[in-house]
Swiss-Prot record:
TM stretches of this protein: none
Protein's UniProt name: UPF0434 protein Shew185_1670
InterPro entries: Trm112-like
Family label: Belongs to the UPF0434 family.
Length: 59
């Protein structure tokens, strides 16, 4: 199932409540403010703080 980019208009980072960006290559939602990536499972964003992955300098 593909991620519906329309969700970006209504979802927010659960940590800072900021805007998320979709990374097509990694299939994740990215919060640049907190430097966190949230997984997307079967087209559904998993916006749980304990599932977030810290971004590395190379990302």
């Amino acid at each position: 199932m593909a991620f519906d980019k329309k969700l970006l208009d209504i979802v927010a980072c659960p940590v800072c409540k900021g805007k998320l960006e979709y990374d097509k290559m990694t299939q994740q939602l990215i919060c640049k403010a907190d430097k966190l990536a949230y997984p997307i499972t079967e087209g559904i964003p998993v916006l749980l703080e304990n599932r977030a992955v810290p971004l590395t300098e190379s990302v």
